[in-house]
From Swiss-Prot:
The keyword S-adenosyl-L-methionine does not apply. It comes from Drosophila melanogaster. This is Pickpocket protein 28. It comes from the Eukaryota. Expressed in water-sensing neurons in taste bristles on the proboscis but not in carbonation-sensing taste peg neurons (at protein level). Expressed in the tracheal system. The gene is ppk28. Belongs to the amiloride-sensitive sodium channel (TC 1.A.6) family.
Length: 606
């Protein structure tokens, strides 16, 4: 009897999900099927989603409920279909390139870097002093693409090759006769510096100083002796960051002083046709390239030619591409552009597509030919410079890189998200040096009447902006998360009346409501135990009566004393409910002879 009583006490005091069939309140247990069904019906009737309340409506017939249920399923399928179309469009083309609504000033952009190369790569007077059987002559012939002795296995350093090129090429002070910028004549040596390109030694204007362009810069990179420039201060500039806020009065690279020929760059060049020895073209004159100040030029393939004896006008239009910071969250393979801090180059400090392609070409040559061409980035300080014996290998690699049809390609060099390029057009006319011809150009007289008065050897170039404003293009998100969310929410609201509050409702009915119901049941069970705690002293008389009647059957166990019940009368429930609770708490199951015999009654509980 005691074991049975303790077992029933544990069963009645558990807070699990088992339902006690003898308790009216336990029928509301949260884990019961009936409770779950009632919760689902309650949600359907009170949900903000369209059509669900008709499924749970009891006043309509079952076919009508089925109709609304199928309609709701169809609406969900249509919503998923249209949302998937929006997602495919969002994931396939997340970037849109649009014209900026705000115009930019050319004065906020650097004037383009201009590289000018004489088509003659070696002066005849300098070559005559080199022995025809020497290694230097063979290297020179390799530079001129005239073969040379390809049996010579040249193993030299970049410093040695640089010395040969500087020695035989036309220096900038001999090529540049006159320079003016911003309507002011200036010393050409202050404006132009020597630079090595794929066309040999050239003269460059307005490029970044090598200390801002190259990592691990040293004086070995310099081609000429540095001369102090007390007027212009060298500063850093990148397409992404632009100029610093506080700029000196005179700085380099320079910005445009205005529009038109007078405010642009004007140079007078001397071709020195009598000194021509070798050239990569079939004409005499100059090859010119307009490029970004933060990039090294490749003049051989991309420069335009101005023949000697011609005057050229070259109007320039800047083309600037920027990007919004929001596209950083998009994968690189999707947006197809890189920010400056996302792909550091080994040799250059500033990332651009052309700088990346130069490094890529150097790496491929080093891998395939075990050497690097003299004008390419020296990614390996110990790598040798390619000589005449490497021409066959270097030509093959460069052809494959430019064709982009083989494994030797630089497809991973994506454009920068911020890039500045320049669009230049060329128009030329013949120079007339007849003294009877009255020229309107504000050029010095000594150019036409001095030692370089031969008009057939002179070229005049004018670089200038046509306008001081331009429009840039901006890369931005075509579909940001906000746009995707609004499109999705619009479709769900159109088909189902869905909103953020619908999500809150679902969360409430799955988590908050079951928790609150379970907590309420536990509190109700706890109060019930407190109400029945007064029956504990009453059990002793009953047990003594059981021991006295151990020999017979206890038909009706004696009830507790009436005086013990009197003080707890305020806690009693309804009479019938209290009788059943009292009988279960006593844990005494009477032995009955007939199955239909009624439970014992306690009249004083009324």
């Amino acid at each position: 009897m005691r074991t049975l009583t303790e077992s029933r006490r544990r069963q009645s005091g558990s807070s699990g999900c088992k339902k006690d069939s003898e308790s009216d309140d336990d029928e509301n247990t949260i884990c019961s099927r009936a409770a779950i069904k009632r919760s689902v019906v309650y949600y359907l009737k009170n949900s903000t989603l369209h059509g669900l309340k008709y499924i749970a409506e009891e006043s309509i017939t079952i076919p009508e409920r089925i109709f609304f249920g199928l309609a709701f399923v169809l609406v969900v399928i249509l919503s998923v279909f249209f949302i998937s179309n929006v997602y495919v469009k969002w994931s396939a083309s997340p970037i849109i390139i649009s014209t900026s609504a705000k115009q930019k000033l050319t004065s906020n952009m650097p004037f383009p870097a201009i590289t000018i190369c004489n088509l003659n790569q070696a002066l005849l007077s300098k070559v005559d002093r080199i022995g025809r059987t020497s290694t230097n002559f063979s290297l020179l012939m390799g530079l001129c693409d005239q073969g040379g002795d390809t049996t010579i296995s040249y193993i030299g350093t970049w410093k040695y090759f640089k010395a040969i090129l500087v020695d035989v090429a036309q220096p900038c002070e001999k090529m540049l006769l006159y320079c003016s910028f911003g309507s002011r004549e200036e010393d050409c040596s202050w404006l132009f510096t020597s630079i090595l390109t794929d066309d040999g030694l050239c003269c460059n204007f307005n490029a970044l100083h090598p200390s801002y362009l190259i990592r691990n810069y040293s004086d070995d990179v310099r081609l000429e002796t540095a001369h102090p420039n007390t007027r212009y201060e060298l500063i850093d500039w990148t397409p992404e960051k632009g100029y610093a806020r506080n700029l000196p009065e005179f700085y380099f690279p320079r910005t445009s002083g205005g529009t038109g020929i007078r405010m642009g760059l004007t140079v007078v060049l001397n071709a020195s046709i009598a000194e021509y020895y070798c050239t990569k073209s079939m004409s005499v004159g100059f090859k010119v390239l307009v490029h970004n100040p933060a990039e090294l030029p490749k003049v051989s393939n991309y420069g335009f030619v101005v023949t000697a004896g011609r005057e050229a006008r070259i109007p320039i239009e800047p083309v600037y591409e920027d990007a919004l910071p929001t596209i950083r969250s998009i994968k690189k393979s999707v947006r197809r552009c890189l920010f400056s801090d996302e792909n550091d180059l080994a040799y250059y400090r500033t990332y651009s597509r052309k700088n990346c392609e130069l490094e890529c070409e150097a790496k491929l040559l080093l891998r395939e030919c075990s050497c690097v061409l003299y004008y390419l980035p020296r990614i390996d300080p110990l790598a040798r410079v390619c000589g005449p014996n490497d021409n066959q290998c270097t030509d093959r690699v460069q052809t494959e890189i430019e064709s982009s049809l083989t494994n030797l390609s630089c497809e991973n060099c994506w454009p920068g998200c911020f890039e500045l390029t320049y669009r230049a057009t060329l128009s030329t006319a013949s120079i007339v040096s007849d003294p009877r011809f009255q020229a309107g150009e504000n050029l010095p007289e000594y150019i036409f009447h001095g030692p370089y008065s031969n008009a057939s050897e002179i070229s005049i170039l004018h670089f200038y902006y046509m306008t001081n404003i331009f429009r840039s293009t901006t890369k931005s998100e075509m579909f940001g998360f906000t746009e995707f969310l609004s499109n999705t929410g619009g479709l769900l609201g159109l088909f189902m009346g869905f909103s953020i509050f619908s999500v809150i409702e679902i969360f409430f009915y799955i988590t908050v409501r079951p928790y609150c119901a379970s907590r309420t049941l536990r509190q109700r069970h706890k109060r019930r135990l407190e109400q029945l705690s007064w029956l504990t002293p009453i059990r002793m008389p009953v047990r003594r009566a059981l021991r006295r009647n151990r020999g017979g059957l206890l038909r009706n166990p004696p009830p507790p004393a009436y005086s013990d019940l009197q003080k707890f009368r305020g806690k009693l429930d309804k009479p019938e409910t209290c009788k059943r609770k009292l009988w279960r708490t006593l844990q005494v199951r009477p032995v009955v002879d007939r199955a239909d015999e009624e439970l014992p009654t306690y009249p004083y509980l009324d």
